[in-house]
Amino acid sequence: MGIIVQKFGGTSVGSIERIQHVANRVIEEVQKGNDVVVVVSAMGKTTDELVNLAKQISNHPSKREMDMLLSTGEQVSIALLAMSLHEKGYKAVSLTGWQAGITTEEMHGNARIMNIDTTRIRRCLDEGAIVIVAGFQGVTETGEITTLGRGGSDTTAVALAAALKAEKCDIYTDVTGVFTTDPRYVKTARKIKEISYDEMLELANLGAGVLHPRAVEFAKNYEVPLEVRSSMENERGTMVKEEVSMEQHLIVRGIAFEDQVTRVTVVGIEKYLQSVATIFTALANRGINVDIIIQNATNSETASVSFSIRTEDLPETLQVLQALEGADVHYESGLAKVSIVGSGMISNPGVAARVFEVLADQGIEIKMVSISEIKISTVIDEKYMVSAVEELHEAFGLAEEAAAVRS
């Protein structure tokens, strides 16, 4: 057979009982004749607990020392999983990110993987061992330990699958797959059997938390087939791959949404490109992520620009904008972003009109809109967020089309 990479998140290894369950899932794959590489996150809330410990020492801890501290969380879970497999009669070896040959750039807290030397992993596999790798971490060329930021364990797993030329990468989570929308809010949400990399990447970027965007981007670039599955259920999950053979007739594949959005409008900025660039360069330098951007001319000499941000970034955004001479800044909080995604929109005109019609019928005002080939995002009042998602979910027939699949 081939190499299979499995990734288990913090919830999946959150207790000794769950680690024992994960060991059994790993053994099931080994018994199929596959070589197995397992990537695990820190147990449960371990990372949060480590962050809190650091805050008790310092309000502004060194990023280098934070990486040293946070990287210990995964070391606990990989060692315990290896011990569990030993007790069940299987040869297993745990490796930290740097022992596994994962080299990253020189950026503490949010490093990107630059290279993976798979020599040691392959040697362990050749010796008949199950290899368990700590997610979320690596080492620079100068020997400094780094962490990969949010979603880092997903990225570790996909990067290893690419480097090892694995048959596929299974991402085990606390949900059974990728749904048409969040089933906690929309009861008619259904699981999607297959979805393309591009569609999954859009959903991930829009806040669908099942997969991190960086991991999906890695999978797309290296054509790594992904399956999102539940660690607690034997139910088949959602395949993420290049070619989607089913449901091609579906115009919309999923709906993502997020609350705590604020619209910021800057009026009276000088009407030339450098002026606008100065605003967004300053925001980027402060680590503020700007989403939808709309620019309008107010007169022959000045213009206004509106953009959306996370509400938590508002205080820092206002600090940046206060430095602009002659500009008048307004903002509106209590907003939400609702987005529909689907490759079928490329060849089906009128999707945006249908979205506007559905929202208008519910008396929902659209405050901002952004449209791309496979995505339409709208910013609306937060109080209408769930009802808007429900109405769009029904209008595009998502509840009837994407049925769950059991193995």
UniProtKB/Swiss-Prot annotation:
Pathway: Amino-acid biosynthesis; L-lysine biosynthesis via DAP pathway; (S)-tetrahydrodipicolinate from L-aspartate: step 1/4; Amino-acid biosynthesis; L-methionine biosynthesis via de novo pathway; L-homoserine from L-aspartate: step 1/3; Amino-acid biosynthesis; L-threonine biosynthesis; L-threonine from L-aspartate: step 1/5. Substrate binds at residues 25-30, 47-49, 74, 125-126, 150-153, 289-291, 295, 351-352, 365-366, 372-373. InterPro entries: AceGlu_kinase-like_sf, ACT-like_dom_sf, ACT_Aspartokinase, ACT_dom, AKii-LysC-BS, Asp/Glu/Uridylate_kinase, Asp_kin_monofn, Asp_kinase. GO terms for biological process: diaminopimelate biosynthetic process; homoserine biosynthetic process; lysine biosynthetic process via diaminopimelate; threonine biosynthetic process. ATP binds at residues 7-10, 41, 173-174, 179-184. Its EC number is 2.7.2.4. Pfam families: AA_kinase, ACT_9. Lysine-sensitive. One of its GO terms (molecular function) is ATP binding. The lineage of its organism: Bacteria, Bacillati, Bacillota, Bacilli, Bacillales. Catalyzes the phosphorylation of the beta-carboxyl group of aspartic acid with ATP to yield 4-phospho-L-aspartate, which is involved in the branched biosynthetic pathway leading to the biosynthesis of amino acids threonine, isoleucine and methionine. Keywords: Amino-acid biosynthesis, ATP-binding, Diaminopimelate biosynthesis, Kinase, Lysine biosynthesis, Nucleotide-binding, Repeat, Transferase. Residues 264-338, 340-407 form the ACT domain. GO terms for cellular component: cytosol. The record marks 7, 74 as: Contribution to the catalysis. It catalyses: L-aspartate + ATP = 4-phospho-L-aspartate + ADP. This is Aspartokinase. Belongs to the aspartokinase family. It comes from Geobacillus stearothermophilus. Tetramer consisting of 2 isoforms Alpha (catalytic and regulation) and of a homodimer of 2 isoforms Beta (regulation).
